[in-house]
Amino acid sequence: MASETETFAFQAEINQLLSLIINTFYSNKEIFLRELISNSSDALDKIRFESLTDKSKLDAQPELFIHIVPDKASNTLSIIDSGIGMTKSDLVNNLGTIARSGTKEFMEALAAGADVSMIGQFGVGFYSAYLVAERVVVTTKHNDDEQYVWESQAGGSFTVTRDTSGEQLGRGTKITLYLKDDQLEYLEERRLKDLIKKHSEFISYPISLWTEKTTEKEISDDEDEEEKKDAEEGKVEDVDEEKEEKEKKKKKIKEVSHEWSLVNKQKPIWMRKPEEITKEEYAAFYKSLTNDWEEHLAVKHFSVEGQLEFKAVLFVPKRAPFDLFDTRKKLNNIKLYVRRVFIMDNCEELIPEWLSFVKGIVDSEDLPLNISREMLQQNKILKVIRKNLVKKCVELFFEIAENKEDYNKFYEAFSKNLKLGIHEDSTNRNKIAELLRYHSTKSGDELTSLKDYVTRMKEGQNDIYYITGESKKAVENSPFLEKLKKKGYEVLYMVDAIDEYAVGQLKEFEGKKLVSATKEGLKLDESEDEKKRKEELKEKFEGLCKVIKEVLGDKVEKVVVSDRVVDSPCCLVTGEYGWTANMERIMKAQALRDSSMAGYMSSKKTMEINPENAIMEELRKRADADKNDKSVKDLVLLLFETALLTSGFSLDDPNTFGSRIHRMLKLGLSIDEDETAEADTDMPPLEDDAGESKMEEVD
């Protein structure tokens, strides 16, 4: 008896949606497979849930699976699952006559420029089949109904027929896509495997692909010879047996066989208990996730339960990628799943920029499937997930720090990220600060933490001292450290460009203020005798300070007697809230710097002179004798320019500085000035350049 076929009209909105999908060009059509596999996974979830209370529900088909069958002969691709299936009314209602609330919203989102890949979020993922197919046939069998076939070419209507003659499914759904002529790539085994791995690798049911295997078999012509024997019986030749064996023709025949190939071999590792997973399994998962050829350095596997549920596995690689801070590169190190379905791998809201090197996956039970980027920015669930991820990452770094060798590797690769964290993450700043490591005046070749520094602080020392500069070599003999070293205070060497930014935010650690050795406001404990001596020297050198200020003009803001320099004649310090010499150097190196900021941030310098230094004492005597003495002015300018260099600044006019040095050399070697008068005619008069700043403005 022929089955009756019923024809139904698509509901108006669904018709509109189909028209949009078919007639608009979308570049990422490949998402259809993700959507259909996701639907299969949902159907399997439903039957698995029903079977918990009634095992007989699985009798018709005990195995839970998803099968993908490409058929090049008919240009069809079938997705088969042993899920819950659909009754006739499910078919009619779900696939065409009742518009889901999401249909209209999805079309509005598409019109507003949203991506077609969001389709599943609106509950209409099935229709993505029409991105690649001109005709779709759905065969389905529910435990409570007979087998039915739904069919449509999306021309405004669909048909539903009771299936009596077709292959019986037992239970489940088979979707057959009759592919468009320009979409036949989806019949290729490699393409399908890549797609399943990309989008559906961690679906919790086995996804098997029907693959074709062609093997070549090489056989001798024995079989053919038997057939020809009768015809050739009369032609007998005396041929050497061995020769005949050699010359016997070989024949290649192709054998074609088909078999199921399991694609999602990687079981969702995050669904298992951490204690059950071996180091090798984590390593294999890490490599499959990141395509890294090395194993990871550390892993954190955890789940959060309660009002919000998600599971995550986070990895720290052994080395930093070459493009770690490439701002043009999309961050795609954390893959976001929702209930085992891959959603996206470049979700910027999931993890802050300073943790961009951490790789892994997050699987949420609460986020809606296929959540859009716009919704992500507002999503409260995601904000909670992000907060937890940051917390767990910091915990992981502390775990790495327990092994000194591992932490050294980690710190070498990712210290800049931690410092960026100090700069950007006010919530976790104090915690991240404990992870910082620096060389210091007392640490030798080892790195020291701020915590260790605090334990070594001298009695009466209230602040943590640091110096910033270009390199350890550049700062370890800096004049700024002389007094601090003499008093036995430890000074941290901050020689990474990003240290300047980090320390700008990290004002203190464990209640101890971080104080720069190169800025104003360095106050060191002094005895009464020291204070008295300082006042006397201040008075004694007051005249020289005025002379130096007159000579240097607006190159310096003021000239004072120093209590930080012990051996050097002088140094140049910057304002407490302005840029250090090192920061000025960094800002000059910025090709696209903001020049408006430089004017007020590159603060005026204060020249601090050392009254105990023999050069300064001699200069004082000469200035007291005659403040217009030409040699005094020349010496002051030379000392200033030398102090610029030793204090970490750059010279605006190195040629003039060189000429001054040469003049001093001549004096030292008693070379008569008249002999070289001609050569000196180009030298600028010392008095004229006194009022002009020779420092390059940082613009």
UniProtKB/Swiss-Prot annotation:
Molecular chaperone that promotes the maturation, structural maintenance and proper regulation of specific target proteins involved for instance in cell cycle control and signal transduction. Undergoes a functional cycle that is linked to its ATPase activity. This cycle probably induces conformational changes in the client proteins, thereby causing their activation. Interacts dynamically with various co-chaperones that modulate its substrate recognition, ATPase cycle and chaperone function. The gene is HSP81-1. ATP binds at residues 39, 81, 126, 373. The TPR repeat-binding motif mediates interaction with TPR repeat-containing proteins. Pfam families: HATPase_c_3, HSP90. GO terms for biological process: cellular response to heat; protein folding; protein stabilization. SUPFAM superfamilies: ATPase domain of HSP90 chaperone/DNA topoisomerase II/histidine kinase, HSP90 C-terminal domain, Ribosomal protein S5 domain 2-like. Keywords: ATP-binding, Chaperone, Cytoplasm, Nucleotide-binding, Stress response. NCBIfam families: PRK05218.1 (NF003555). This is Heat shock protein 81-1. Residues 215-250, 672-699 are annotated as: Disordered. It comes from the Eukaryota. InterPro entries: HATPase_C_sf (IPR036890), Heat_shock_protein_90_CS (IPR019805), HSP90_C (IPR037196), Hsp90_fam (IPR001404), Hsp90_N (IPR020575), Ribosomal_Su5_D2-typ_SF (IPR020568). It is found in: Cytoplasm. Residues 672-690 have a biased composition (Acidic residues). PANTHER family: HEAT SHOCK PROTEIN 90 FAMILY MEMBER. Belongs to the heat shock protein 90 family. One of its GO terms (molecular function) is ATP hydrolysis activity. Homodimer. GO terms for cellular component: cytosol; perinuclear region of cytoplasm; plasma membrane; protein-containing complex. A motif (TPR repeat-binding) lies at residues 695-699.
